A protein has these predicted regions:
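Sec/Tat signal peptide C-region and signal peptidase I cleavage site
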Residues: 22-26
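Short, well-structured alpha-helical segments in soluble
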Residues: 74, 82-99
Length: 151
């Protein structure tokens, strides 16, 4: 239960942080990118993450959205293919104009999309632990790094 509330809070913060990337004219929705493998070898792990983000978006929208605007999920399948992940990330940021993206399950995926988010000055929420020693103002690393874990 606490994890679900944490995810909802992160989604709201991410959506709010991404509002500055929106055009000045009024919009009815705030687009949220979901960048996960829904096919291929990683689908077994990442499909659940996609479902969790969709559930959080539904709950936020049921309570009035963010600043009165509904969140609109834009789901893409990166098919467990890291070069494809970079292409899909670019599509989310450039064509779909998402305010924020939740995605990737592996460090290989994160490293392949990182240049896209940094170049576009867009925001990626990375949901799992990682090896550390990487810092980007465009990524929220929500999982622990090795120096944050106790044996």
């Amino acid at each position: 239960m606490q994890r679900r509330h944490s995810l909802k809070a992160h989604a709201a913060v991410a959506a709010l942080a991404g509002l500055s990337a929106l055009p000045a004219h009024a919009q009815d929705t705030i687009k949220v990118g979901i960048l996960h493998s829904l096919s291929g070898t990683m689908a077994i792990s990442e499909t659940v993450l996609k479902d969790t983000v969709l559930m959080a978006i539904d709950e936020i929208n049921a309570k009035g959205g963010v600043l009165g605007k509904k969140l609109e999920p834009v789901v893409v399948d990166i098919a467990s293919n890291w070069p494809l992940a970079a292409e899909k990330a670019k599509q989310l940021v450039s064509q779909d104009k998402v305010a924020v993206t939740f995605g990737c399950w592996t460090s290989s995926c994160r490293k392949s999309v990182l240049p896209v988010y940094e170049e576009a000055n867009s925001l990626l929420y990375y949901p799992v632990q990682y090896e550390g020693e990487e810092l980007s103002k465009n990524v929220f690393y929500t999982g622990a790094a090795p120096n944050q874990q106790a044996i």
